[in-house]
């Protein structure tokens, strides 16, 4: 069977490659950044400028983040707090949003791609993260150009499929550049876009409304399942070819239809759950799923609840607050 398939592949560059199913990044290190007291105190003076929903109780935020770390320890999950690796002369105001380590870069099976933050309040995040990645000897395979907006909360990976959301923070320029350069490293790439501009801070990134876990399981905001929703997302699939390039493999379709067509087990979440970052789940190396919302906790069997409501005031959740690199 294998030799026959190989011969068939050699005869046509238009046929897709066959790959082993990619598993989540097992045995790697989660990177985190504990809430910085001085930075949050500065941000509390102008919550709009620093992208907060409202003023944050620093002590509560630090306590909840510490509780998050404790759960990671209990689950045997490796992690590192990068706060001790920050240059000491870094201005505190540049650290207000760095707690959300997810956004400055994405990690694909090919390596680390440094993004390009859209909001001025986060323009320093990339250079700070880049310096830290160098300290950990992590190679950067690409840095997005100025016209290529890319934030890590818009990138998700599951079962050899990359999902990249575009819209409020990441754009098509970045999505297509990674396609052109072959940097996704998965058999399929699904680029997702809204039918109407989306600016709500509750939905700025893909991981705020959708997250896959396990293999072909996912949680998704219920509103996205309605065909006439003004928040509807569309999806275009690209498939890896024998020559290493990606070719569009389907017409744009409703994202929820794409998930159904690809046999995803779909768990829908209410708007209240979505506002509580119910879709912003974090899957650990051991397969356990961490959640921060009661509804999601009930719907994902065996999930672990992590109190995180104070940090939600900064417009982010558990997945937003982590990223990873090769140990």
Residue ranges and their predicted role:
Residues 15-327:
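The feature marks the mature, well-folded catalytic cores of soluble enzymes
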Residues 1-17, 21:
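Arg/Lys-rich, intrinsically disordered low-complexity tails that mediate electrostatic binding
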């Amino acid at each position: 069977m294998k030799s026959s398939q190989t011969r068939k592949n050699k005869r046509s560059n238009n046929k897709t490659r066959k790959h082993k199913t990619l598993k989540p990044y097992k045995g790697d290190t989660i990177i985190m950044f504990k809430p910085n007291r001085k930075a949050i105190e500065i941000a509390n003076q102008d919550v709009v400028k620093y992208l907060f929903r409202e003023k944050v109780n620093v002590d509560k935020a630090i306590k909840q983040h510490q509780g998050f770390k404790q759960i990671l320890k209990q689950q045997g999950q490796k992690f590192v707090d990068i706060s001790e690796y920050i240059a000491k002369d870094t201005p505190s105001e540049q650290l207000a949003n760095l707690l959300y380590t997810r956004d400055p870069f994405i990690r694909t099976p090919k390596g680390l791609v440094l993004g390009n933050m859209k909001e001025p309040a986060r323009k320093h995040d990339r250079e700070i993260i880049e310096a830290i990645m160098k300290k950990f000897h992590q190679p950067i395979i690409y840095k997005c150009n100025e016209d290529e907006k890319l934030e890590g909360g818009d990138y998700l990976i599951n079962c050899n499929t990359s999902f990249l959301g575009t819209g409020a923070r990441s754009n098509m320029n970045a999505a297509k550049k990674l396609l052109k350069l072959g940097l996704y490293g998965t058999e399929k790439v699904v680029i997702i876009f809204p039918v109407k501009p989306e600016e709500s801070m509750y939905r700025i990134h893909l991981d705020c409304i959708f997250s896959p876990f396990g293999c072909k399981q996912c949680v998704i905001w219920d509103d996205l399942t309605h065909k006439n929703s003004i928040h509807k997302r569309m999806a275009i699939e690209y498939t890896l070819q024998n020559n290493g390039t990606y070719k569009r493999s389907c017409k744009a379709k409703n994202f929820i239809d794409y998930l159904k067509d690809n046999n995803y087990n779909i768990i829908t979440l209410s708007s209240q759950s979505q506002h509580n970052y119910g879709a912003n789940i974090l899957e650990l190396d051991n397969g356990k799923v961490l959640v921060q919302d009661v509804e999601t906790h009930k719907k994902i069997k065996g999930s672990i609840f992590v109190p995180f409501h104070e940090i939600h005031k900064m417009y982010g959740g558990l997945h937003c607050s982590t990223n990873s690199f090769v140990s």
